[in-house]
């Protein structure tokens, strides 16, 4: 697929999926590969043929939508974010929970890919923070639209490149080095519940002290869908809870009841 054809096709189809072209500039070639594979499977010869196919087969939009999700993740991605979570956010939330007589901190990792983000959070809590708050238990819900990504997260086995940002001592302590790669130990998997879920259609019923929504809604969704998603996230946050977005992402304009905790790290607090 030539780039000019791919760009024109994405600029046509993405708005119909409530996605925005600007979020796909850097990852568009990965989407091209998926679309090209789909064309071959359908016996189509060009993106023009595929566009015609979409117009006569509305069920194909679901397939195209799934082709537009590009998981890019690794452990401890954006080191400064996890340092701020360690030094400020999680201790503050733990103290808040203690003051309310609670024994559980609830976290939600959205677009968790193969589990790198929620497991990083589990490592951070168990290796750096838990000793300060021995009566507090961290539980993490990790969701992703991709059932194959969730299956990989359940296996918990990763190539060395996924762990390159982790402190060396954490790799030694929390992973078994196997022939397949680095397998995270069960005690660090235990706090994490993995679930296939599309945030555009379903959100959990419970509320959370910490929500991480990085490099998903505020990169790929269009303005209206971003605003709707943010309203739902705020509704699912505890008062005083924290929302973490991706490096370089911005929240949509409007009154959502959030105040900056660290704008540099993309962390906000529900007022």
Locate predicted features:
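Extended basic-aromatic, gly/pro-enriched interface segments that bind polyanionic ligands
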Residues: 110, 131-225, 250-252
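Core SAM-dependent methyltransferase catalytic element
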Residues: 252-271
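Conserved AdoMet
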Residues: 2-108
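Conserved class I S-adenosyl-L-methionine
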Residues: 102-120, 141
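Conserved SAM-binding loop of SAM-dependent methyltransferases across substrates and taxa
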Residues: 114-133
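Conserved beta-strand signature within the Rossmann-like core of class I S-adenosyl-L-methionine
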Residues: 239-247
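A short glycine-rich, Lys/Arg-flanked "PGG" loop and its adjoining helix->strand segment in the class I
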Residues: 226-239
């Amino acid at each position: 697929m030539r780039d000019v054809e791919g760009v024109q096709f994405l600029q046509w189809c993405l708005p119909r999926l409530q996605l925005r072209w600007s979020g796909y500039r850097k990852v568009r070639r990965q989407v091209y590969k998926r679309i090209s594979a789909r064309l071959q499977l359908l016996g189509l010869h060009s993106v023009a043929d595929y566009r015609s196919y979409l117009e006569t087969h509305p069920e194909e939009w679901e397939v195209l939508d799934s082709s537009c999700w590009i998981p890019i993740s690794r452990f401890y991605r954006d080191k400064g974010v996890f340092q701020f979570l360690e030094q400020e956010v999680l201790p503050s939330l733990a103290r808040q929970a203690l003051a309310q007589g609670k024994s559980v901190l609830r976290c939600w990792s959205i677009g968790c890919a193969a589990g790198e983000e929620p497991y990083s959070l589990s490592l951070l809590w168990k290796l750096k923070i838990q000793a300060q708050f021995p009566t507090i238990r961290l539980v993490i819900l990790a969701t992703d639209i991709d059932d194959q990504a969730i299956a990989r997260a359940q296996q918990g086995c990763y190539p060395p490149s996924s762990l390159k940002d982790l402190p060396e001592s954490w790799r030694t302590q929390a992973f078994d080095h196997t022939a397949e790669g680095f397998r995270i130990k069960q005690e660090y998997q235990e706090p994490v519940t993995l679930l296939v879920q599309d945030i555009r259609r379903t959100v959990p019923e419970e509320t959370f002290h910490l929500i991480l929504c990085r490099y998903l809604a505020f990169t790929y969704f269009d303005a209206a869908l971003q605003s709707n998603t943010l309203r739902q996230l705020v509704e699912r946050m505890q008062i005083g809870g924290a929302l973490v977005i991706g490096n370089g992402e911005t929240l949509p304009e409007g009154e959502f009841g959030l105040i900056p905790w660290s704008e540099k790290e993309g962390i906000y607090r529900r007022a």
